[in-house]
């Protein structure tokens, strides 16, 4: 979550008049994240999240995102719900941006995830994949291989400012992935951004998943590779195979993977590492000064990519033999 667009109290109260939210007591911007402008509201009827959609989020995609949250919630997955306006619409407009009110989900994200949390995330991810079956809408992944190839030229010229030799390294990796990327794996709706700050816990119990604004249709195993990258590396850059095994075991307890999915894990992990390297690099080079947003260091994902380049089989991630 982040703030790119400021709002004022007068406009906010006019916006809230279209909802049955009670009286506004306070609001403040939320700095975490990189995609939309988010605010925590307190009203006489409770806490809410206000999201203004901008940057990579296309207005035409919003029915998919908001509808998916409704679908998953109806299937029993704990996730935020978009609140309808008095006219039944899920979207309004504030400060020139499409905007929605989202229910507040209890819990906090973990700054130091441990092994048991990784297992819980694996279980929750597989549960989400199964719960999303039957969702009627479709959204192609804008950040798939073709998306990386399109984004890279926007950062390529200045890449070596961030790390000498980075331009040539990413050039070579894109060539490799173009030749090795799987063509036919089990697919469905994926979260595509299930980082620790998008998973809430109450104590050691997972209380819900948030931030579905990268959700799309793609390989289900690719979503697991994103989570292995996001949850199973230590601060020193080393891969924690105990955490990886716990996450994989948690996932497999809910949904089994085909032999083709297992065999593809090393290249999928390379791809997901490159995806976040590229978007972080682009944001690092282009985020406006003064934006209330936490820019994320791109080279963390270069180190992860280099690890995956040396992996030969899924067993090195903790896959059961």
Swiss-Prot record:
Any one GO molecular-function label of the UniProt entry: homoserine kinase activity
Keyword Lipid biosynthesis: no
Pathway: Amino-acid biosynthesis; L-threonine biosynthesis; L-threonine from L-aspartate: step 4/5
Key words, A-Z: Amino-acid biosynthesis, ATP-binding, Kinase, Nucleotide-binding, Threonine biosynthesis, Transferase
The keyword Methyltransferase belongs to this UniProt entry's keyword annotation: no
UniProt record similarity statement: Belongs to the pseudomonas-type ThrB family.
Disulphide-bonded residues: none
CDD domains membership: HomoserineK_II (cd05153)
InterPro entries in UniProt: Aminoglycoside_PTrfase, Homoserine_kinase_II, Kinase-like_dom_sf, Pseudomonas-type_ThrB
GO biological process: threonine biosynthetic process
UniProt catalytic activity: L-homoserine + ATP = O-phospho-L-homoserine + ADP + H(+)
Gene expressing this chain: thrB
Enzyme type, top EC level: transferase
EC number(s) recorded for this UniProt protein: 2.7.1.39
UniProt-recorded name of the protein: Homoserine kinase
């Amino acid at each position: 979550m982040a703030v790119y667009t400021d709002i004022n109290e007068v406009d906010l109260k006019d916006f809230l008049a279209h909802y049955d939210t009670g009286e506004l007591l306070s609001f403040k911007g939320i700095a975490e994240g990189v995609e939309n402008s988010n605010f925590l509201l307190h009203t006489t009827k409770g806490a809410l999240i206000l999201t203004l959609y901008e940057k990579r989020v296309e207005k035409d995609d919003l029915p998919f995102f908001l509808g998916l949250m409704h679908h998953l919630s109806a299937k029993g997955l704990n996730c935020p719900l978009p609140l309808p306006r008095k006219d039944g619409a899920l979207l309004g407009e504030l400060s020139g941006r499409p905007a929605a009110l989202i229910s507040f989900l209890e819990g906090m994200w973990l700054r130091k995830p441990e092994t048991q949390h990784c297992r819980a995330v694996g279980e929750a991810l597989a549960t989400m994949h199964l719960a999303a079956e039957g969702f009627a809408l479709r959204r192609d992944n804008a950040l798939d291989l073709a998306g990386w190839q399109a984004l890279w030229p926007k950062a390529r010229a200045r890449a070596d400012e961030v790390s000498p030799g980075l331009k040539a390294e990413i050039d070579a990796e894109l060539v490799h992935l173009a030749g090795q990327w799987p063509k036919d794996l089990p697919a469905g709706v994926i979260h595509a951004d299930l980082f620790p700050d998008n998973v809430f816990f109450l104590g050691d119990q997972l209380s819900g998943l948030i931030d579905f604004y990268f959700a799309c249709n793609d390989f289900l195993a690719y979503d697991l590779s994103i989570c292995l990258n996001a949850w199973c590396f230590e601060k020193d850059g080393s891969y924690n195979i105990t955490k990886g095994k716990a996450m994989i075991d948690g996932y497999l307890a809910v949904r089994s993977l085909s032999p083709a999915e297992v065999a593809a894990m090393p290249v999928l992990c390379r791809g997901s590492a490159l995806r976040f390297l590229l978007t972080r690099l682009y944001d690092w080079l282009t985020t406006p000064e003064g934006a209330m947003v936490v820019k994320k260091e791109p080279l963390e994902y270069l180190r992860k990519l280099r690890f995956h380049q040396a992996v030969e089989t899924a067993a090195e991630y903790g896959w059961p033999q």
